[in-house]
């Protein structure tokens, strides 16, 4: 069953990208197990929880709201991993945060309404699962592995004004210079 919100307002930035927010939800601060949820369109496929930002909503607040609705978890919002663009089928610009899960609800909005499931994956396994049908979601985890993990001391990312934000597009791969990673 597909999710539909009749009162949903889509928000777009100045360049026409749909504004989205998502979280990589980790079981612990070691960031070795990530929570994925089943897609509302294709229930046998796994995705990173996230969705559209509401008017006047900050990206971090939207990310926390989306994981609560889609994954039924609450947690400690951490660093902004990056802002990712998807240009192929739809123009999306997604703010992706790291969240350490502190509370797991037994029943949550999307499990009750559309039968959404959630499952913990080792990061390597999650990348493999996502690469087939959601390569941009796999890129979130690839970027995390490339040097934004807490182990290397880059645990905080300064907030950047919109015109100076770091963007990673779905077309870009591991050929990024180390200064961008």
Swiss-Prot record:
It is found in: Cytoplasm. Mg(2+) 2 binds at residue 66. Mg(2+) 1 binds at residues 50, 70. Binds 3 Mg(2+) or Mn(2+) ions per subunit. It comes from Homo sapiens (Human). Substrate binds at residues 10, 18-20, 39-41, 90-92, 116, 134. Cleaves a beta-phosphate from the diphosphate groups in PP-InsP5 (diphosphoinositol pentakisphosphate), PP-InsP4 and [PP]2-InsP4 (bisdiphosphoinositol tetrakisphosphate), suggesting that it may play a role in signal transduction. Also able to catalyze the hydrolysis of dinucleoside oligophosphate Ap6A, but not Ap5A. The major reaction products are ADP and p4a from Ap6A. Also able to hydrolyze 5-phosphoribose 1-diphosphate. Does not play a role in U8 snoRNA decapping activity. Binds U8 snoRNA. The active site is at 69 (proton acceptor). The lineage of its organism: Eukaryota, Metazoa, Chordata, Craniata, Vertebrata. The keyword Protease does not apply. Keywords: Cytoplasm, Hydrolase, Magnesium, Metal-binding, RNA-binding. Belongs to the Nudix hydrolase family. DIPP subfamily. Its EC number is 3.6.1.52. This is Diphosphoinositol polyphosphate phosphohydrolase NUDT4B.
